[in-house]
């Protein structure tokens, strides 16, 4: 199966809903990782392709609203350093008919929001590598042309990791 990755900020091309619909006619295309930032797309794509078109958020920061509107998950950057919490968040955020789980999703989202933001202050994957190094998962070394994050960014990431109860 193939998941289309629609990320206009990096590709400079936005695959519109009609293009998605045409691609979905192909046997192996099952859905999209949507990093457009346009939350209205979820409803538009669901209307055009139906419920079998898998819609995954490509942005941690908007994943809650994305899932509320009909998405079914997120291909997450933050999950690289907070897998368990992100998994709990996703499970709760797709449980629209359970007010307790939605409250839990909101609570987790508030806890993770500073981390989501901090992991994109500088070019990816340098911030994620630094966050992972705080968990002793790896070193913060990156290869050129990437560089390590600045001291200011390190402080922001560390603070966000503490806020999320990860360190």
Predicted features and spans:
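Glycine/proline-rich, positively charged
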Residues: 1-50, 54
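Short, well-ordered helical secondary-structure segments
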Residues: 2, 19, 56, 115, ...
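Glycine- and other small-residue-rich loops at beta-strand/loop junctions that grip anionic moieties
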Residues: 5, 9-12, 33-35, 56, ...
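A generic "binding-loop/recognition-motif" signal
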Residues: 38, 59-62
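Structured C-terminal cap/extension of enzyme domains
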Residues: 61, 65-167
């Amino acid at each position: 199966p193939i998941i289309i990755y629609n990320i206009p900020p990096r590709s400079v091309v936005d695959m519109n809903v009609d293009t998605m619909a045409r691609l979905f006619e192909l046997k192996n295309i099952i859905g999209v990782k949507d990093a457009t930032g346009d939350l209205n797309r979820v409803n538009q794509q669901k209307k055009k392709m139906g419920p079998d078109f898998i819609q995954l958020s490509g942005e941690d920061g908007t994943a809650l609203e994305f899932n509320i509107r009909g998405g079914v998950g997120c291909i997450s950057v933050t999950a690289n350093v907070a897998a368990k919490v992100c998994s709990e968040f996703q499970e709760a955020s797709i449980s629209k008919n359970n007010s307790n789980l939605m409250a839990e999703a909101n609570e987790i989202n508030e806890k993770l929001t500073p981390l989501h933001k901090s992991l994109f202050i500088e070019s990816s994957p340098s911030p994620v590598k630094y966050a992972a190094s705080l968990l002793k998962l790896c070193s913060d070394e990156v290869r050129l042309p990437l560089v390590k994050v600045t001291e200011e960014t390190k402080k922001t990431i560390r603070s966000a990791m503490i806020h999320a109860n990860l360190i």
